[in-house]
């Protein structure tokens, strides 16, 4: 009888342990508009709220690359001044205790979160908590600024690099899926491509934005589409390229691609393509250049940040848009990323 009791107790403990190891991905309820918080991060590590008030200066921050959120928590990747590897959570530094084989400078180009895991892109590795996952054939690979996304435990990384199969000296668009490398397709005759934007969802699905030759482009499920521009090529003179996609998202089965195109005065114009149709997003102030930096969907709403630059000075303004309407302007705040809590 005693042995039966011990066996039953051990079995119960085993069930408890197994149950505690099977974590479901957290699902956060969509907050009503009035309860949401928009946070913006600058390259130097200042965190601002939607009203433009300074929330916090990230401690020991040399460079802040990206900000994401999960529920009421926010996470920032970048470069820590003391050379440590990790991230900021709600403004406090968290060190990842990772044993590196290579002595390299640590610069994180992206951050992702799934379940209880934090992913950091620290070339040539992806760090998953304290685990190290080496990117396949990473030589000559150039990551995008926001190069990493995770969906239900599947990790994606984007950028561009050279192809040994077609060694013509031109960059090709690169996608890593769980650290395995592939070059994305381009139209016949195209010579160069770059990936700059990434959105992953439902584990196996991706939308990627960037440029093919001199035109803005999007890859949906790895199939390319060249996006149209407003200004005909013959009016633009000898520009290196016509436009580029910098950020992508999906909302209610519509694909949103934010970036810029050039006009006939050779000015960058902040542009949003919705299902491939371009529209310009300008605040009304006379500016020398503008671009859409980042776009994200929250529930049924779409938020976007644009930046406008004025003349030869360093003056700039960031603008927050909600569903196509300008809702806030930030004077002389340079934004490297934003998120919605």
Question: Locations of the language-model features?
Answer:
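Sec-dependent N-terminal signal peptides
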Residues: 6-11
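Residue-level hotspots at or immediately adjacent to binding/recognition sites across diverse folds
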Residues: 23-341
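C-terminal motif of bacterial Sec signal peptides marking the signal peptidase cleavage site
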Residues: 17-20
């Amino acid at each position: 009888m005693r042995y039966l009791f011990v066996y039953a107790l051990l079995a119960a403990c085993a069930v408890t342990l197994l149950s505690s190891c099977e974590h479901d991905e957290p699902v956060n309820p969509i907050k009503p508009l009035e309860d949401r918080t928009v946070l913006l991060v600058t390259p130097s590590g200042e965190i601002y709220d939607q009203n433009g008030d300074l929330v916090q200066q990230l401690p020991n921050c040399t460079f802040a690359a990206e900000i994401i959120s999960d529920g009421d928590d926010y996470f920032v990747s970048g470069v820590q001044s003391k050379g440590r590897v990790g991230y900021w959570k709600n403004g406090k530094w968290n060190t990842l205790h990772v044993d590196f084989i290579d002595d390299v400078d640590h610069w994180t180009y992206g951050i992702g979160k799934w379940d209880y895991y934090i992913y950091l892109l620290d070339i040539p590795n992806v760090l998953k908590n304290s685990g190290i996952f080496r990117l396949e054939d990473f030589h000559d690979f150039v990551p995008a600024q926001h190069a990493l996304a995770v969906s239900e435990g599947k990790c994606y990384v984007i950028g561009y690099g050279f192809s040994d199969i077609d060694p013509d000296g031109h960059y090709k668009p690169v996608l890593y899926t769980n650290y395995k490398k592939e070059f994305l397709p381009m139209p016949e005759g195209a010579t160069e491509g770059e990936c700059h934007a990434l959105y992953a969802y439902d584990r196996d699905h991706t939308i990627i934005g960037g440029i093919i030759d001199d035109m803005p482009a999007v890859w949906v499920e790895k199939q390319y589409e060249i996006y149209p521009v407003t200004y005909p090529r013959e009016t633009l003179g000898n520009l290196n390229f016509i436009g580029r996609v910098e950020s992508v998202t999906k909302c209610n089965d519509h694909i949103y691609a934010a970036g810029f195109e050039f006009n006939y005065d050779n000015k960058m114009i902040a542009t949003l393509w919705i299902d491939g149709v371009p529209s310009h997003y300008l605040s009304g102030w006379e500016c020398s250049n503008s671009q859409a930096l980042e776009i994200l969907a929250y529930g049924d709403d779409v938020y976007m940040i644009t930046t406008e630059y004025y003349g030869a000075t360093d003056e700039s303004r960031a603008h927050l848009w909600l569903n196509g309407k300008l809702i806030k302007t930030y004077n002389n705040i340079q934004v490297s990323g934003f998120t919605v809590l």
